[in-house]
């Protein structure tokens, strides 16, 4: 072999093999790498990813553990907790095993929560994100419009998630997004719309790819889009989407399908409470076809394979919500009063009165804080000025019903009723 021929032979800069000893030699700036070294590098990276995923899996709580942790923050809704625990566990188990070579590809299972206002839909989603320590964002479906119209683009949802994790794209890819009021973007009829529906069917169409999995182009640091801008590329394939809505009157669609109640002279006359219980039972029988009749397009329903329902909270559940969870309202107000050196005691009849009022207002658990806040407004206004010598404040049903003032107990004194200055 001549010296000129030797000079023309290229060698891998890593293993030293010549171009004749390997299948492919890739050239770079003054450097060459063979296909064997590339395969070796890929194997090393894959092994590290599997090791990291394995470590993350060890920390992933099992469905019963997720259920128990949900119990610490959310009262009732046992069936919904069970469904969510399994769904979330499978979702993150799937993410942890994506690096393994397998012919079976597991699809993402997004979730639809159906339940009345104040039943705990948002709280369940928030608590799941807290348990799993993943980024979490909430979006309101009623503010979304198609791109190019006044309102929020659907891609703004991803931007909110990025903001929650300081624009760490890799972290955002494993987050949870909760879209509230999803029932409000239902079209008015179950036939395709002939006119432009920018906040209903149009939004459903825009959400399809985002929920299923696409690469969204997001302006960095919340800026507006313009042609010369560099975008952050966010793959939504591994983001878990949980949609929630009240779906008012959905039970009527299910009732017509199941044909449980007669009409006209054949109709059974029942009290209002029975109809409420009947509606709750019917909602549990929700099928994809019922949601399509309600106004969700079939493609959108197909992207939400896991459907679970939440029950309307009764008086007992609302009373437990006031006292039992880790961040219960009563515990929060006790802490607030402790800052002033005063103890506050809510009697059981007061808790019952608060729960009854929330049921009357049809606000569920969401309305509990506003009722307590309104009740204690005057007391909290005057408390800093009268806290000296005050040991305890007792709240009973009379205070909630505004029939009597709180009971003040001073140091070295028996209980006495005092009216807060107004």
Curated annotation (Swiss-Prot):
Name of protein: ATP-dependent Clp protease ATP-binding subunit ClpX
Which species is listed as the source? Answer: Coxiella burnetii (strain Dugway 5J108-111)
Question: Which controlled-vocabulary keywords does the entry list?
Answer: ATP-binding, Chaperone, Metal-binding, Nucleotide-binding, Zinc
Any one Gene Ontology MF annotation carried by this entry is: protein dimerization activity
Q: Which GO terms describe its biological process?
A: cell division; proteolysis involved in protein catabolic process
User: What does the entry list as the binding residues for Zn(2+)?
Assistant: 12, 15, 34, 37
Keyword Chaperone assigned to the entry: answer is: yes
Q: Can you quote a single GO CC term?
A: HslUV protease complex
PANTHER family per the UniProt record, alphabetical: ATP-DEPENDENT CLP PROTEASE ATP-BINDING SUBUNIT CLPX-LIKE, MITOCHONDRIAL (PTHR48102:SF7), ATP-DEPENDENT CLP PROTEASE ATP-BINDING SUBUNIT CLPX-LIKE, MITOCHONDRIAL-RELATED (PTHR48102)
Q: What is the lineage of its organism?
A: Bacteria, Pseudomonadati, Pseudomonadota, Gammaproteobacteria, Legionellales
Listed under subunit, the entry gives:
Component of the ClpX-ClpP complex. Forms a hexameric ring that, in the presence of ATP, binds to fourteen ClpP subunits assembled into a disk-like structure with a central cavity, resembling the structure of eukaryotic proteasomes.
Any Pfam family: zf-C4_ClpX
Function of the molecule: ATP-dependent specificity component of the Clp protease. It directs the protease to specific substrates. Can perform chaperone functions in the absence of ClpP.
Annotated ClpX-type ZB domain residues: 1-53
Membrane spanning residue stretches: none
């Amino acid at each position: 072999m001549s010296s000129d021929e030797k000079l023309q032979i290229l060698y891998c800069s890593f293993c030293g093999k010549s171009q004749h000893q390997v299948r492919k030699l890739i050239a770079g700036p003054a450097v060459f790498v063979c296909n064997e070294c590339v395969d070796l590098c890929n194997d090393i990276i894959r092994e590290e990813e599997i090791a990291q995923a394995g470590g993350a899996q060890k920390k992933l709580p099992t469905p019963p553990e997720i259920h128990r942790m949900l119990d610490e923050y959310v009262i009732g809704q046992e069936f919904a907790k069970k469904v969510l625990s399994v769904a979330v566990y499978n979702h993150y188990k799937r993410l942890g095993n994506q690096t393994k070579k397998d012919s079976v590809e597991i699809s993402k299972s997004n979730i639809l929560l159906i339940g009345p206002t104040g039943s705990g839909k948002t709280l369940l989603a928030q608590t799941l994100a807290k348990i799993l320590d993943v980024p979490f964002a909430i979006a309101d479906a009623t503010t979304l419009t198609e791109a190019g119209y006044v309102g929020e683009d659907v891609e703004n949802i991803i931007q909110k998630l990025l903001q929650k994790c300081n624009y760490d794209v890799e972290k955002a890819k494993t987050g949870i997004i909760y879209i509230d009021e999803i029932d409000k973007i239902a079209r008015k009829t179950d036939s395709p719309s002939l006119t432009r529906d920018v906040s209903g069917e149009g939004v459903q169409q825009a959400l399809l790819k985002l929920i299923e999995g696409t690469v969204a182009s997001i302006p960095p640091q919340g800026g507006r889009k313009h042609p010369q801008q560099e975008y952050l590329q966010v793959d939504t394939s591994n983001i878990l989407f949980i949609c929630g809505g009240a779906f008012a009157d959905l039970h009527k669609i299910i009732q017509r399908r199941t044909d449980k109640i007669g009409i006209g002279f054949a109709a059974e006359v029942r009290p209002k409470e029975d109809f409420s219980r009947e509606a709750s039972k019917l909602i549990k029988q929700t099928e994809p076809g019922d949601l399509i009749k309600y106004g969700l397009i079939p493609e959108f329903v197909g992207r939400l394979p896991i459907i679970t329902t939440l029950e309307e909270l009764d008086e007992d559940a609302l009373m437990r919500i006031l006292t039992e969870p880790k961040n219960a309202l009563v515990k929060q107000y006790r802490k607030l009063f402790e800052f002033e050196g005063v103890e506050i005691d809510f009697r059981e009849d007061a808790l019952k009165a608060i729960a009854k009022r929330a049921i009357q207002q049809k606000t569920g658990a969401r309305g509990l804080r506003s009722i307590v806040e309104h009740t204690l407004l005057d007391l909290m206004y005057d408390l800093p000025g009268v806290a000296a010598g005050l040991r305890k404040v007792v709240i009973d049903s009379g205070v909630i019903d505004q029939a009597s003032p709180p009971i003040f107990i001073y140091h070295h004194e028996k209980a006495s009723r005092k009216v807060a200055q107004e």
